Amino acid sequence: LSAPFHYADFTVDPAPTRDSLIRQLNDDHVPVIGLRVTPGFMNLNGGILTEPGPPTDGHAVLLVGAARYTGPDLGVVEPGDQLMCIQNSWGTSWGANGYALIGPRAWDDMVFVSALLTPR
């Protein structure tokens, strides 16, 4: 292959945990996440996706960050909740400029696989 393409190896985790994915982020990796798309995900316009929903399809996104929520209890997001930040490929009109925060209930319901690409 010639630049900008490169060969890569990959490992698949069929049951990724938030902690294992955060360790990958801390090691400067960007995990690819397989998730079940819900109507809330499809139509996300800013904000945080907090509630699971009926799956309508599958999709892959990049996990680019994680944060622990420290604000007041909002009912759908509580202090201490771990929010996962993803980057989608659907352009800047989706989510918040192409990114979204996913709350723990939605994350646990939607995510079913991760893959980690590593250079050869």
List each model region and its residues.
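Predominantly the structural core of cysteine protease catalytic domains
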Residues: 1-87, 92-120
